[in-house]
Amino acid sequence: MDPEIHVGMRAAVLTISSSRTRREDDESGNALVAFCEEAGIETVYDSVTDDRAAIATALKRLADNEQVRFIFTTGGTGLTRDDVTPEATLDVIDREAPGFAEAIRVESRQHTPLGILTRGVSGVRGRTLIVNFPGSPKAVRQSWPVVEPTLRHAAETLERG
């Protein structure tokens, strides 16, 4: 990745976990932060428990107050009752941008049959793109190369409104 490609862009990484994850223990969130930084994207980090209202509140705060162009979530996209990240994301976006989530599912499916179980969504709130990544560090590492090449164009498009 050429770090000059994304200079000036800012992202938030939001980890969703059943227990408030300590930053040093958050492999998936830290992987996303590292990928962003390697790509020259300034990154802020936050975590929240797997409560739909808490996730929605964090997404709104990050999109509306932190001047981030992207929010990358990790966790809460599976099939358990507590996996509510997609619902919280749908609660706050203005419109869907399904290609990101679809590409993540396709890439995940190439590595494991379980890749079809992720329910992640993606969409736009204001001028911020929100993408749900799976909670597995391995799935994050496999999915990032599918998403990253599109970010410059996505940012430019969002900037135009």
Region spans (language model):
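Non-catalytic beta/alpha edge segments that cap or flank active sites
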Residues: M1-G161
